[in-house]
C-alpha cells in the first residue's frame, strides 16, 4: 500500500498535524476537532493546507 504522510495545517486553530494521504477514516484536528481529511476510496479529500510531505512511500 503506497501513500504519503502529509503535514496539514488546520484552518480553524492553526494546528499542524501529520496524517496519511489515503486515510480510510475521517481525520479530525486533535486540538479543535474540525475535519482535516475525508476518505474518498483513494486519496483523502484534504480540508486544510498541505504544509509538507513528511514521508513519501
From Swiss-Prot:
<keyword id="KW-0479">Metal-binding</keyword>
<dbReference type="GO" id="GO:0008270">
    <property type="term" value="F:zinc ion binding"/>
</dbReference>
<keyword id="KW-0862">Zinc</keyword>
<feature type="binding site">
    <location>
        <position position="32"/>
    </location>
    <ligand>
        <name>Zn(2+)</name>
    </ligand>
</feature>
<keyword id="KW-0687">Ribonucleoprotein</keyword>
<protein>
    <recommendedName>
        <fullName>Small ribosomal subunit protein eS27</fullName>
    </recommendedName>
</protein>
<feature type="zinc finger region" description="C4-type">
    <location>
        <begin position="10"/>
        <end position="32"/>
    </location>
</feature>
<comment type="subunit">
    <text>Part of the 30S ribosomal subunit.</text>
</comment>
<keyword id="KW-0689">Ribosomal protein</keyword>
<dbReference type="GO" id="GO:0006412">
    <property type="term" value="P:translation"/>
</dbReference>
<feature type="binding site">
    <location>
        <position position="10"/>
    </location>
    <ligand>
        <name>Zn(2+)</name>
    </ligand>
</feature>
<dbReference type="InterPro" id="IPR023407">
    <property type="entry name" value="Ribosomal_eS27_Zn-bd_dom_sf"/>
</dbReference>
<dbReference type="GO" id="GO:0003735">
    <property type="term" value="F:structural constituent of ribosome"/>
</dbReference>
<dbReference type="InterPro" id="IPR000592">
    <property type="entry name" value="Ribosomal_eS27"/>
</dbReference>
<dbReference type="GO" id="GO:1990904">
    <property type="term" value="C:ribonucleoprotein complex"/>
</dbReference>
<comment type="similarity">
    <text>Belongs to the eukaryotic ribosomal protein eS27 family.</text>
</comment>
<keyword id="KW-0863">Zinc-finger</keyword>
<feature type="binding site">
    <location>
        <position position="29"/>
    </location>
    <ligand>
        <name>Zn(2+)</name>
    </ligand>
</feature>
<dbReference type="GO" id="GO:0005840">
    <property type="term" value="C:ribosome"/>
</dbReference>
<feature type="binding site">
    <location>
        <position position="13"/>
    </location>
    <ligand>
        <name>Zn(2+)</name>
    </ligand>
</feature>
<dbReference type="InterPro" id="IPR011332">
    <property type="entry name" value="Ribosomal_zn-bd"/>
</dbReference>
<dbReference type="Pfam" id="PF01667">
    <property type="entry name" value="Ribosomal_S27e"/>
</dbReference>
Amino acid at each position: 500500500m503506497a501513500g504519503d504522510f502529509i503535514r496539514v495545517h488546520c484552518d480553524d486553530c492553526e494546528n499542524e498535524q501529520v496524517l496519511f494521504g489515503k486515510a480510510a477514516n475521517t481525520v479530525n484536528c486533535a486540538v479543535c476537532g474540525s475535519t482535516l481529511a475525508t476518505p474518498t476510496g483513494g486519496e483523502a479529500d484534504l480540508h486544510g493546507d498541505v504544509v509538507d510531505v513528511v514521508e513519501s512511500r
